[in-house]
Amino acid sequence: MIKWPWKVQESAHQTALPWQEALSIPLLTGLTEQEQSKLVTLAERFLQQKRLVPLQGFELDSLRSCRIALLFCLPVLELGLEWLDGFHEVLIYPAPFVVDDEWEDDIGLVHNQRIVQSGQSWQQGPIVLNWLDIQDSFDASGFNLIIHEVAHKLDTRNGDRASGVPFIPLREVAGWEHDLHAAMNNIQEEIELVGENAASIDAYAASDPAECFAVLSEYFFSAPELFAPRFPSLWQRFCQFYQQDPLQRLHRANDTDSFSATNVH
């Protein structure tokens, strides 16, 4: 179900959205009750402000809408929903989609090619996603399409183009750039050693700073146990920027699981 901004008051009294069910995905397991409540509040506002547009026969129901909204709002849980200003629509294909890509080489020749995309984020336009990869974003694997595209949106708030440096105090920019490029170099060294497919972190992170920030944002929220020990200095910068500590959440979730296991009779 799509909630339209001009129908908020009308629909709010008619349909109770399945937030409790929507929260029951591995990615959100470690959230406290207070964090869950805050996230749902943001997600409700997100659905009031943004238009979710299903394409090519994709069917969008209330549970899917809620989970999409929760994933959009997780990165801005402490930053605030205003950090997601600048776009009003989320276009959702049923599967990865084909786009016409145009690029210019080093000698000025323009090339055209058709490529398959999982998602796209335009600075002053919609975010484009696909449901197959959204579904794969519910677990804690290090892959999260929505967080990746949200990171690009957060990145561009700092200037005209994504640079890998989000909107942080000027005094912190040099340190951020140093740690981000060090991470890129480290990932590239691993790729050269074991190959892209065997690398422990998505090789796309080594392609440029903007993609490194987006990819590591995926790992920050969905695989903190891989990010934090490998890049501790950059991890602290991400914690400071997002004002969250997903590794602490992971430990809390694991402690809860251990306690439950020891009390099974």
Swiss-Prot record:
Binds 1 zinc ion per subunit. It is an enzyme of class 3 (hydrolase). GO terms for biological process: proteolysis. GO terms for cellular component: cytosol. It is found in: Cytoplasm. Its EC number is 3.4.11.-. Keywords: Aminopeptidase, Cytoplasm, Hydrolase, Metal-binding, Metalloprotease, Protease, Zinc. GO terms for molecular function: aminopeptidase activity; metallopeptidase activity; zinc ion binding. Zn(2+) binds at residues 111, 148, 152, 211. Pfam families: Peptidase_M90. Its cofactor is Zn(2+). InterPro entries: MetalloPept_cat_dom_sf, MtfA_enterob, MtfA_fam, MtfA_N. HAMAP family: MtfA. Involved in the modulation of the activity of the glucose-phosphotransferase system (glucose-PTS). Interacts with the transcriptional repressor Mlc, preventing its interaction with DNA and leading to the modulation of expression of genes regulated by Mlc, including ptsG, which encodes the PTS system glucose-specific EIICB component. NCBIfam families: PRK15410.1. Interacts with Mlc. Belongs to the MtfA family. This is Mlc titration factor A. The gene is mtfA.
